[in-house]
């Protein structure tokens, strides 16, 4: 039963079920995609978790992660949770004062820094973040001459963990079994637009629930691919890049760098893609440029068939059945033109395409719909563990953000504020009972207008 599941338990299940037979993670390094199986994923998490344990990490402790999307971010997050602790997300572009506040407020005692830039931030804050015991660096490039005793390196912590695993081979699994659905697995900080950021406590139950409910609406398979490039500190990326892949055992792919995201999307051809409006707008712009730069014959064909796609988009949006002739013409347009365009941009295999964080212009929605790509708007909040309201594939209405996920109760107050209830509603704000009491009165007060 899913009510007893946790992310650590899902990781263990996937490793036992798939072992080395299926890829769980890919990362592009030096131009080559490097693969990690489910067994490898499990071993990395085990090694880092036991390494943290050997440093003194105890149940309820926190690990902060500041860095770009890399497998080590997943390993650190799951390792903390396997030990009964929580991960704290820090955006890689956060300023020093933001980093200082989050580390201190969350009581993080270990910080995993993705690279030299992130490590330098934390080292600069040593005197004002006295609780931090170790700064664990993933990529030590440029840090050869650093000799601060607070520094440690990711691979060295994993090595310590492997040594402990050999001495106590059952310890890690015993720790996984001890993790409970009500355990806080993540403290995710709000933007702080109405004051200081508040730390939302997300439980294992919340994480599994949002993955389960998402999958009830948009089913995924274990052979699906996802490209992870939005910050781990954003709850939307947590849902699509951490919780859902663990729940359905599909692969997560990490781009080589921020500048190669679109190129790497083309290479992978994901089945699931979550992107903010700016990314969809950029792809749309690139499609239009490609059409304009095509040889005159192709450009002529594009110009003749694009109206066919737009007409089909109108039928879809107005929920009208197109005539058979129009439907056949649409298939011809897709086979001759749109499929090759989608393939060039890595969109051919897309089954579930999402946008969130801000509204996407209706003209962008319609352009992709004309090409056969159904982008769905999603609404959620940190306090609801990401999306709770989402478009359905067969019910996309540009004037709305969709309908609630199954088992999610949504109401509005007399003033139009949205209220939400369900298993995905967070436990409360860390060290802020007053704000928690204001937010949760049977239902979650989202502060958003319905």
Residue ranges of predicted features:
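AMP-dependent adenylate-forming
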Residues: 11-36, 143
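Conserved pre-ATP/AMP-binding loop-to-beta segment of ANL
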Residues: 19, 152, 162-189, 196, ...
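Conserved AMP-binding/adenylate-forming core of the ANL superfamily
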Residues: 24-78, 95-100, 153-158, 204
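ANL superfamily adenylate-forming
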Residues: 30, 117-180, 287-340
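Conserved AMP-binding A3 loop
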Residues: 35-39, 177, 185-211
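Conserved small/polar residues in nucleotide/adenosyl-binding loops
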Residues: 190, 445-450
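Conserved AMP-binding/adenylation subdomain of ANL enzymes
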Residues: 208-228, 232-331, 335-338, 349
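Conserved AMP-binding/adenylate-forming
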Residues: 329, 333-447
């Amino acid at each position: 039963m899913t009510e007893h599941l946790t992310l650590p338990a899902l990781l263990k299940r996937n490793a036992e079920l798939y072992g080395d037979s299926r890829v769980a993670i890919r990362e592009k390094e030096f131009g080559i995609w490097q693969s990690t199986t489910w067994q490898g994923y499990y071993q990395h998490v085990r090694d880092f978790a036991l390494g943290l344990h050997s440093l003194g990490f105890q149940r309820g402790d926190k690990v902060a992660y500041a860095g770009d999307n890399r497998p080590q971010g997943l390993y650190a997050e799951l390792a903390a949770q396997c030990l009964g602790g929580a991960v704290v997300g820090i955006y890689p572009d956060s300023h020093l004062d933001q980093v200082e506040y989050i580390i201190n407020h969350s009581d993080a005692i270990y910080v995993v820094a993705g690279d030299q830039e992130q490590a330098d931030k934390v080292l600069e804050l040593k005197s004002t973040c006295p609780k931090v015991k170790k700064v664990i660096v993933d990529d030590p490039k440029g840090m050869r001459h650093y000799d601060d005793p607070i520094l440690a390196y990711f691979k060295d912590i994993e090595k310590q963990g492997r040594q402990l695993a050999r001495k106590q081979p059952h310890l890690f699994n015993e720790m996984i079994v001890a993790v409970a659905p009500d355990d806080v697995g993540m403290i995710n900080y709000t933007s702080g637009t109405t004051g200081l950021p508040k730390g939302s406590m997300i439980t294992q139950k919340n994480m599994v629930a949002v993955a389960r409910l998402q999958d009830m609406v948009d089913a995924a398979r274990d052979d699906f691919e996802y490209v992870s490039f939005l910050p781990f500190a954003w709850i939307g990326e947590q849902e699509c890049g951490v919780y859902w892949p663990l729940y359905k055992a599909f692969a997560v792919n990490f781009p080589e760098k921020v500048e190669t995201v679109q190129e790497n999307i083309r290479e992978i051809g994901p089945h699931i893609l979550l992107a903010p409006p700016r990314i969809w707008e950029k792809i749309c712009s690139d499609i239009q440029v490609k059409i304009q730069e095509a040889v005159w014959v192709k450009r002529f064909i594009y110009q003749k068939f694009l109206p066919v796609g737009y007409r089909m988009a109108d039928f879809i949006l107005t929920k009208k059945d197109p005539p058979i002739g129009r439907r056949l013409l649409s298939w011809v347009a897709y086979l001759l033109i749109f499929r090759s365009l989608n393939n060039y941009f890595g969109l051919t295999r897309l089954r579930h395409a999402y946008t969130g964080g801000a509204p996407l212009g209706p003209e962008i929605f319609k352009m992709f719909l004309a090409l056969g790509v159904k982008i769905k708007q999603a609404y959620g909040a940190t306090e609801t563990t990401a999306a709770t309201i989402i478009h359905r594939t067969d019910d996309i209405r540009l004037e709305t953000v969709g309908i609630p996920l199954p088992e999610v109760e949504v109401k509005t107050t007399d003033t139009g504020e949205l209220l939400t209830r369900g298993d995905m509603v967070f436990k409360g704000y860390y060290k802020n009972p007053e704000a928690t009491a204001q937010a949760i009165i049977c239902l979650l007060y989202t502060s958003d207008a319905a």
